[in-house]
Amino acid sequence: MLTTTLLFIATAMAEIIGCYLPWLWLRQQGSPWLLVPAAASLTLFVWLLSLHPAASGRVYAAYGGVYVVCALVWLWGVDGEALRPTDWIGAALALTGMGVIASGWR
């Protein structure tokens, strides 16, 4: 389960970075060259997602819980926003759902 969770975290970070860089380009007038590492990051995201040990729909559902937590860490660490109590509660619920789904993998 630890290996799967670490793989989910790497997958989420690749997705977040791959989406954040075009956001910088579009919203913050960043360089169009940001699209090159964004494409590489999203390619890595897709490849990492293919490494997960269960049917794709189940993987996507469980991955969503880890993605929520990683996005909140990004919100705090990169965007500089303080997490609210509702963020913490939502993260706990998302991880609980991820754990329930992943516990049924064979």
UniProtKB/Swiss-Prot annotation:
GO terms for cellular component: plasma membrane. The chain crosses the membrane at residues 6-26, 31-51, 59-79, 85-105. InterPro entries: UPF0060. It is a multi-pass membrane protein. The keyword Transmembrane helix applies. Pfam families: UPF0060. Keywords: Cell inner membrane, Cell membrane, Membrane, Transmembrane, Transmembrane helix. Its main location: membrane. It is found in: Cell inner membrane. PANTHER family: UPF0060 MEMBRANE PROTEIN YNFA. NCBIfam families: PRK02237.1. Belongs to the UPF0060 family. HAMAP family: UPF0060. This is UPF0060 membrane protein Csal_2746. It comes from Chromohalobacter salexigens (strain ATCC BAA-138 / DSM 3043 / CIP 106854 / NCIMB 13768 / 1H11).
